[in-house]
């Protein structure tokens, strides 16, 4: 059979790993696919790096558009990142009837609807693939194994970089900046780590997951930059609830065992028991492996609707405003140690129908007149908590900002 020619756009950390994985496992992939699959052209602005990674064995160019327009290329792997050039390259590749594999979550989350109608029109055997590292098994389960099931909620740790940083900080007592530098040295974090540490990458993944679970696509990028890293999504009567933020969960939940650069995702459906998917998330090889797997699957004609539903069935579901979500809360505040402060705080909470589950006041350090107060609340509405925190912070006896963490049982 005719070999499958792959054009690789971008040969940085992930691109270099993808080239290595596909080259190293070439014989195994060929046995499974029934014919050879090989990267035959690479595009990168750094030609010297491209030649170094490929060993000068294949054609390299700094013109990515030449590859997406090359009739000899069957599959385009886009690993450049970003919204602008990557978008034009993907659109051009689709127009030219090529299969596209991309690890660019931001591009898919924000521009899926630009691609789906064109991709369907071209009637190719596979559309855009969404290699989201450890959560891709969940995608397969939803799209292929749970097609008759209604998923109620999913929750997880879906950014390996932030999980690594938090694990290192806890275990070694290191500062955030020091651990971030180590993550960058190990290749777990990008030179500009904003997308990871601000929760934006996790939000992109969560938006795509929500689209796959609930026919929801038009609003994929709404509110991305305003999302506050456990990630939670569920469907309610009022709309889809999407949240990306640090969360306290019971120690007995399996998600609590997810450490270092690993990621995990748990979900529950009406007809199935809770399931959990776990694996390495940060680093070149896990990402490259996911990309290589999708290249192999694309050639073998493994085709399902890419957002789990037929394109003409997708709808625009509302995202529940963050003020309308319900959660229990952990609050930590620093207050002057004097009579009446606790009474003021509890009055503020009570006036807003916020019930206290437990409260601890720590003793002040020697020579200090301020103490930490920790409050656990029962489930309440977010907007009520916002109002309460603003009122508490306005009290003269309160120093600084109130620390707030949401708490989830993950059993609803």
UniProtKB/Swiss-Prot annotation:
EC code: 1.1.1.3
PROSITE patterns per record: ACT (PS51671), HOMOSER_DHGENASE (PS01042)
Binding positions for substrate per the UniProt entry: 190
Keywords: Amino-acid biosynthesis, Branched-chain amino acid biosynthesis, Isoleucine biosynthesis, Methionine biosynthesis, NADP, Oxidoreductase, Threonine biosynthesis
Pfam families linked: ACT (PF01842), Homoserine_dh (PF00742), NAD_binding_3 (PF03447)
Pathway connected to this protein: Amino-acid biosynthesis; L-methionine biosynthesis via de novo pathway; L-homoserine from L-aspartate: step 3/3; Amino-acid biosynthesis; L-threonine biosynthesis; L-threonine from L-aspartate: step 3/5
Gene that specifies this protein: hom
Family membership noted in the UniProt record: Belongs to the homoserine dehydrogenase family.
Keyword Cell membrane tagged: no
One record GO biological process: threonine biosynthetic process
The keyword Nucleotidyltransferase is annotated on this UniProt entry: no
EC category: oxidoreductase
GO molecular function terms noted in the UniProt entry: homoserine dehydrogenase activity; NADP binding
Name of the molecule in the record: Homoserine dehydrogenase
Residue span(s) of domain ACT: 330-407
Annotated catalytic residues: 205 (proton donor)
Residues that hold NADP(+) according to the record: 9-16, 105
Reaction(s) catalysed (UniProt annotation): L-homoserine + NADP(+) = L-aspartate 4-semialdehyde + NADPH + H(+); L-homoserine + NAD(+) = L-aspartate 4-semialdehyde + NADH + H(+)
């Amino acid at each position: 059979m005719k070999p499958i020619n792959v054009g690789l756009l971008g040969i940085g950390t992930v691109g270099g790993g993808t080239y290595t994985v596909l080259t190293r496992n070439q014989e195994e992939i060929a046995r499974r696919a029934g014919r050879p699959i090989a990267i035959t052209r690479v595009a990168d602005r750094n030609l010297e790096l491209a030649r170094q990674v490929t060993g000068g064995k294949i054609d390299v160019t700094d013109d990515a558009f030449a590859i997406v327009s090359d009739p000899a290329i069957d599959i385009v792997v886009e690993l450049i990142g970003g919204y602008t050039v990557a978008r034009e390259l993907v659109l051009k590749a689709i127009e030219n009837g090529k299969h596209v594999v991309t690890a660019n979550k931001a591009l898919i989350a924000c521009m899926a609807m630009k691609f789906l109608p064109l991709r369907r029109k071209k009637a190719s055997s596979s559309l855009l693939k969404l290699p989201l590292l450890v959560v891709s098994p969940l995608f397969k389960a939803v799209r292929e194994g749970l097609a008759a099931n209604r998923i109620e909620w999913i929750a997880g740790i879906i950014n390996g970089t932030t999980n690594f940083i938090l694990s290192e900080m806890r275990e070694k007592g290191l500062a955030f900046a020091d651990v971030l530098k180590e993550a960058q040295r190990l290749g777990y974090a990008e030179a500009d780590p904003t997308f990871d540490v601000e929760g934006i990458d996790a939000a992109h993944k969560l938006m795509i997951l929500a689209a796959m679970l609930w026919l929801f696509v038009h609003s994929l990028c709404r509110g991305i930059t305003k999302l506050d890293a456990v990630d939670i999504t569920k469907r309610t009567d009022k709309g889809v609830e999407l949240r990306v933020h640090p969360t306290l969960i019971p120690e007995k939940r399996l998600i609590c065992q997810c450490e270092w650069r690993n990621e995990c995702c748990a979900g529950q459906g009406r007809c199935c028991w809770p399931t959990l998917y776990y694996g390495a998330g940060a680093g070149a090889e896990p990402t490259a492996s996911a990309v290589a797997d999708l290249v192999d699957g694309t050639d073998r004609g493994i085709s399902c609707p890419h957002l789990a539903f037929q394109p003409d069935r997708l709808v625009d579901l509302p995202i529940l405003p963050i003020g309308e979500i319900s959660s229990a809360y952990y609050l930590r505040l620093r207050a002057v140690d004097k009579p009446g402060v606790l009474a003021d705080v509890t009055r503020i909470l009570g006036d807003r129908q916020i019930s206290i589950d437990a409260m601890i006041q720590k003793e002040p350090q020697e020579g200090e007149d301020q103490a930490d107060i920790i409050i656990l609340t029962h489930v309440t509405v977010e907007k009520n908590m916002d109002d309460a925190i603003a009122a508490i912070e306005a009290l003269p006896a309160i120093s600084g900002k109130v620390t707030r963490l949401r708490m989830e049982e993950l059993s609803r």
